[in-house]
Amino acid sequence: MLGVQKKRSTRKTAARKTVVRKPAAKKTAAKKASVRKVAAKKTVARKTVAKKAVAARKPAAKKTAAKKAPVRKVAAKKTVARKTVAKKAVAARKTVAKKSVAARKTAAKKAPVRKVAAKKTVARKTVAKKAVAARKPAAKRTVSTKKTAVAAKAGVCMKKHKHTAACGRVAASGVKVCASSAKRRTHHNRSRTAHSWRQQLMKLVAK
């Protein structure tokens, strides 16, 4: 260590006592009850006002106007002298002799005679039936499950499906796998996805 080590003082510091602070005593101020001053009521003397006597109203005397009966003047009737017009004697009508209508002759109705067309008997020719040749049931081709069986056919692509004319053209060009939309040999319940197709193509191309 550089220098002289500082000598520690031998004085012992008095152990500090933890000062406990006492909370200041709260002084509760004595509440003075507020005294309400009651205002002294002044008795006001009411003056009695003398009521004035209202003079009784006299009903106004109704004037009854004397109604005069209207006198109707009767117009003097003028007597008009009527002239008697001489009546003209009407000539007696002559009764016209009725012409006797000639008795109508009832034309004898002729019953229309219908001509019955003579039926021609047409001789039907019996058409000789051609004997239909019995169809032979087409021999079912047994599809081999081996993978090499498809590739064995000449001029057919490597794809496992029902081959079409497009497959033959592709195989002739030297390509192993065609891109035809021929029907794949799969079960009708199976659903194919794009991923499964890609995986299968990769396997076929790898061969």
Swiss-Prot record:
Protein name per the record: Histone H1-like protein HC2
Segments for region (3 X 24 AA repeats of V-R-K-V-A-A-K-K-T-V-A-R-K-T-V-A-K-K-A-V-A-A-R-K): 35-136
Biased composition (Basic residues): 1-50, 59-72
Keyword set, alphabetical order: DNA-binding, Repeat
Sequence repeats by residue range: 35-58, 71-94, 113-136
GO molecular function, one term: structural constituent of chromatin
Job description of the protein: Might have a role in establishing the nucleoid structure of elementary bodies.
Classification via InterPro entries: HC2
Family: Belongs to the histone H1/H5 family. HCT subfamily.
GO biological process: chromosome condensation
Region (Disordered): 1-72
A Pfam cross-reference name: HC2
